[in-house]
């Protein structure tokens, strides 16, 4: 019987009497090869059976022959994605793994049987079904995967959800592969399995799931290009069995969250207090600490809809657009060190313009897809704009406020001009991270271990970016040369030297040349021309820059791009398509993660099949509604924040103490670096200055500035608190973890202490009515002491230099005398003396002390003190020498509490 017919005999017999849509499931291969084989045995299929079996045995894993260099002179593609290469490696080489003449002596059998030396140990038992499958495949010719064979469509799993009741409960997964010819085969014995949390459920190599402990996770099944997760839920209490309490669900978000909590027996926390809500939403939405006056007013407001009103106010505030523009800068990679000098618009200018371009659109509530379109389709020139007109426009921007003027143009070309974003590979990786929330790095070299992407998928996807260029476009080189000649720029100058000359001319008001982001024309067929001295026509040599004629969106069909002016248009259309599985989900998940400490998919930038959502119905709902509301970002923020789920307390119930992924309570989390610095500055500022900061984003760290109020120490402080480095395609560039260095900074850093004691700050404002003269005297004494310390340091350095040079005699004696004199004027360990003329400080009334204490709590923790806290703080004031000292110490102590640095 011919091998192609023999291999289909079993499948045809099972499906002959049934329509394709109702084809029976082919029994698993371990049953079909359980007994001794006969002459009529089916031929195992290389793609459907042999390669998955090698994966199941561990042969093509990363620790074995699937590593990038193989093992023992034999290599397989990682997890078996390259069927052609795998077949060639099995059949060829100096030591073929298959022996068609004597199949039983094939190395692919002998080594895993350990009949010959094998570093991987024993993987097969003689006579097992696995042994029979491989032996039969070789015996029948070791055929490769047929080019015209049916393609893999999907993997179906049963059960689709597992609900455990006690440890030790078990379930057998059943995996069915569905092929394009209608074949449905039970491939459970050929699958690989993993549990995402062994503390909740384990899964063995046969697909047997066993409950381990309370919680929820997924078990994931891998076969061919299929990756399918199955949720496992193990209730944490008996409430899941029918005694679950009546929990309010005023919004659809709440309904979907509580639906899962009910299965887990988790009761959500109560609503947070008004003070907690105000602090939480102000920090989350605007990156701004509420002022003391704002907290007082909100708590006193009797209107039942005051939370919704406050939300609307915050969405209209400058802080909202500033803070979320900074987040978008994180995701799009606005990195000062990696932006290129584009000629006159240097890196700092480009960085500020990038931020302002995003901020202005977020403030105007431009739909998210339109913001993205301005980035994805970005080029430097406007429609039908000549190169000279482009240079005139950019030069005019420089004469005004460049960032403001630049923000008015429709595109953001700086996204494409970054130094770390120039190759098609870099762009494919960065694009997938920024707009799709997908990590495809693995697929650059091999099959993604936790997703469907292959190396071929990556190569086809990167073709969308091969024609995007940054620099001098081919059609503008002559104009650039002519412009430089008119300007009198030395033609011998290159690079930075030429840029310096151009910048000088720009400052004088001249129109100067600019580099640009552009898209090269699609490739043309090579023209035919006669060869010299011959009568035959020869095609021209291809251009040096080769560009792809086709490209493929992730998980989609191949697209013809050689006739498109800009291949990126296909990507934009695909992302807007309502069937796109990534675009809306990625931004919805990132916004959700900003509010709940974790995403519905966590990490938020890893939307892979093996990393499924903790609540898929919730993510699907939000993504679909976001699309239906025309990608309205303010709608998204308002919808999430208005939910009861967002407004739950951080105080736990008996059932949700350990829950951090199902949104049953607010999870306290450290505030981001920029927010922390602004909060410190606002908390230490006088009331008027704090109000100004709250009403404006100017000079704020959340506004992409360098923390103006912190002077030169701003960058260091931002680094201490984990500001995003924007160096890689990973949300992990921003650190939200607490550290010892942060504690040291808050307690002892010179600039931190200077914020508390600064002139015009809150401490001075509340203490000055009681000790104005004393403050001036103390300030003078401190200034005198610092001058003396500086003189001592100078004298010591001079003396040390003289000794190093070997100077002796009179000069050395004079230096020693100068040092001694300076030391006599230094304060040493004694406190600075206060002028006798200074009037004594007036004692504040008890009501004044209570007011100061209350204000300190409101401006730092956004709540009044408890009775115990107020009593303790008031007592400290009575025990301390001055109001200034007591207020300073109280403010310092509050800034060093966990409650201040945590959003809850």
Language model regions located:
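Long, His/Glu/Asp-enriched segments that create or flank divalent metal/ion-associated functional microenvironments
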Residues: 683-707, 711-747, 757, 785
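Positively charged n-region of N-terminal signal peptides that target proteins for export
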Residues: 1-7
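Primarily short, surface-exposed interaction patches in extracytoplasmic proteins
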Residues: 245-319, 324, 330-699, 731-734, ...
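Bacterial N-terminal signal peptides
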Residues: 7-19
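Solvent-exposed helix-loop boundary motif
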Residues: 23-131, 149-176, 184-250, 280, ...
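Sequence/structural segment immediately N-terminal to covalent heme-attachment motifs in c-type
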Residues: 45-62, 129-137, 427-443, 890
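Catalytic cores of secreted or luminal carbohydrate-active enzymes
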Residues: 124-144, 737-760
């Amino acid at each position: 019987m011919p091998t192609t017919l023999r291999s289909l005999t079993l499948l045809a017999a099972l499906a002959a009497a049934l329509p394709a849509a109702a084809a029976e499931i082919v029994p698993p291969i371990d049953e079909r090869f359980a007994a001794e084989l006969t002459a009529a045995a089916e031929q195992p299929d290389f793609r459907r059976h042999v390669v998955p079996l090698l994966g199941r045995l561990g042969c093509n894993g990363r620790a074995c022959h699937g590593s990038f260099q193989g093992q023992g002179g034999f290599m397989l593609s990682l997890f078996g994605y390259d069927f052609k290469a795998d077949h060639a490696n099995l059949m060829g080489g100096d030591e073929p793994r298959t022996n068609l003449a004597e199949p039983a002596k094939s190395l692919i059998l002998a080594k895993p049987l350990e009949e010959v030396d094998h570093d991987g140990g024993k993987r097969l038992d003689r006579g097992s079904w696995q042994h029979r499958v491989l032996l039969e495949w070789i015996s029948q010719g070791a055929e490769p995967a047929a080019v015209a064979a049916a393609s893999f469509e999907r993997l179906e799993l049963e059960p689709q959800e597992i609900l455990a009741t006690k440890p030790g409960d078990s379930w057998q997964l059943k995996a069915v592969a569905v092929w394009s010819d209608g074949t449905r085969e039970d491939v459970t014995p050929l699958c690989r399995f993993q549990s995402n949390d062994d503390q909740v459920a384990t899964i063995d190599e046969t697909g047997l799931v066993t409950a381990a402990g309370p919680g929820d996770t997924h078990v994931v099944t891998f076969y061919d290009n299929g990756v399918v997760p199955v949720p496992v839920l193990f209730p944490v209490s008996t409430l899941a069995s029918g005694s679950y309490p009546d929990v309010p669900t005023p919004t659809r978000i709440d309904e979907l969250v509580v639906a899962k909590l009910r299965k887990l027996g988790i009761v959500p926390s109560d609503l947070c207090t008004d003070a907690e809500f105000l602090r939480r939403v102000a920090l989350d939405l605007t990156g701004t600490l509420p002022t003391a006056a704002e907290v007082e007013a909100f708590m006193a407001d009797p209107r039942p809809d005051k939370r919704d009103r406050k939300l609307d106010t915050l969405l209209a505030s400058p802080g909202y657009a500033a803070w979320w523009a900074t987040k978008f800068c994180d995701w799009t990679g606005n990195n000062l060190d990696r932006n290129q000098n584009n000629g006159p618009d240097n890196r700092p200018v480009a960085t500020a313009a990038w931020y302002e371009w995003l901020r202005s659109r977020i403030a105007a509530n431009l739909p998210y897809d339109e913001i993205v379109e301005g980035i994805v389709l970005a080029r430097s020139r406007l429609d039908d704009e000549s190169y000279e007109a482009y240079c005139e426009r950019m030069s005019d921007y420089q004469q005004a406020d460049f960032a403001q003027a630049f923000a008015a143009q429709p595109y953001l070309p700086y996204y494409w001009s970054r130094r770390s974003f120039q190759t098609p590979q870099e762009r494919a990786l960065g694009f997938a991270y920024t707009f799709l929330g997908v990590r495809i790095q693995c697929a650059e070299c091999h099959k993604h271990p936790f997703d469907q992407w292959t190396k071929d998928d990556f190569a086809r996807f990167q073709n969308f970016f091969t024609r995007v260029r940054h620099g001098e476009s081919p059609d503008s080189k002559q104009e650039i040369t002519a412009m430089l000649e008119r300007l009198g720029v030395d033609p011998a100058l290159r690079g930075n030297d030429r840029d310096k000359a151009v910048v000088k001319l720009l400052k004088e008001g001249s129109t100067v040349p600019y580099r640009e982001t552009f898209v090269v024309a699609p490739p043309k067929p090579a023209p035919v021309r006669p060869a010299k001295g011959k009568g035959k026509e020869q095609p021209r040599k291809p251009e040096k820059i080769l560009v792809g004629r086709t490209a493929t969106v992730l998980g989609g069909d191949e697209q013809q791009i050689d006739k498109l002016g800009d291949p990126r248009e296909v990507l934009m259309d695909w992302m807007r398509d309502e069937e796109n599985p990534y675009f809306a989900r990625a931004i919805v998940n990132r916004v959700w993660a900003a509010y709940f400490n974790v995403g519905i998919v966590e990490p938020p930038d890893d939307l892979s099949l093996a990393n499924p959502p903790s609540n898929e119905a919730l993510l699907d709902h939000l993504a679909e509604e976001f699309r239906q509301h025309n990608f309205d970002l303010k709608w998204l923020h308002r919808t999430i924040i208005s939910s009861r789920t967002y407004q739950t307390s951080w105080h736990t119930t008996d059932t949700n103490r350990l829950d951090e992924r199902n949104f049953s309570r607010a999870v306290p989390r450290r505030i981001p670096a920029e927010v922390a610095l602004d909060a410190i500055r606002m908390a230490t500022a006088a009331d008027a200055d704090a109000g100004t900061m709250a009403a404006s984003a100017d000079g704020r760290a959340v506004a992409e500035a360098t923390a103006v109020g912190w002077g030169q120490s701003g960058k260091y402080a931002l680094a201490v608190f984990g500001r995003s480095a924007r160096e890689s395609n990973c949300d992990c560039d921003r650190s939200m973890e607490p550290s010892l260095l942060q504690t040291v900074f808050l307690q002892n850093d010179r600039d931190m202490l200077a914020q508390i004691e600064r002139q015009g700050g809150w401490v001075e404002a509340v203490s000055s009515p009681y000790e104005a003269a004393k403050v001036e005297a103390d300030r003078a004494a401190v200034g005198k002491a610092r001058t003396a310390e500086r003189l001592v340091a100078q004298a010591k350095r001079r003396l040390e230099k003289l000794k190093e040079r070997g100077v002796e005699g009179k000069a050395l004696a004079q230096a020693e005398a100068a040092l001694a004199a300076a030391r006599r004027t230094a304060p040493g360990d004694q406190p600075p003396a206060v002028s006798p003329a200074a009037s004594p400080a007036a004692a504040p009334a008890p009501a004044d002390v209570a007011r100061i204490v209350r204000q300190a709590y409101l401006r730092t923790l956004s709540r009044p003190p408890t009775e115990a806290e107020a009593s303790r703080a008031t007592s400290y004031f009575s025990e301390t020498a001055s109001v200034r000292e007591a207020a300073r110490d109280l403010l310092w102590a509050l800034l060093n509490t966990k409650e201040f640095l945590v959003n809850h």
